[in-house]
Amino acid sequence: MRECRSHDTILVQINPVERQGTPRSARDILNRLNEVSFNAVLLKELRMIAMLRQVAEPGNCEGALWAGMRIHRVTSEEMSLLGASSKLIAEWEFLCKLRDLGRSAAESFLAAHASDIGQRSSYDLDTLLKGV
């Protein structure tokens, strides 16, 4: 944060935080375990940022950086449906599909939140602190 002049951070989330249903097969359980493990670290970091933003003193140089931080999140429903095995696919057609899904997600995000960038967070980190 200290090395960057931008106060906006854009999180491109490709692993879903929640999935419908309960995994039943060993493969599905392992895939979900990998997603939960990755997301646990991400959510811990985001919660830490949310807490720092709440307690930071805006007048303090370091506190001003945290207090002024703006968070945005780009998600894709279609990408969240992809299983863990998709991370091993290196075929050109599939990579082009991922590129197109990413562009579509970015366009949707910008249509909804372009005016937020540079002004305010479009992702409410404080919701992550509920129950903490």
Residue ranges: model-predicted function:
Residues 1-132:
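Non-catalytic peripheral regions of patatin-like phospholipases
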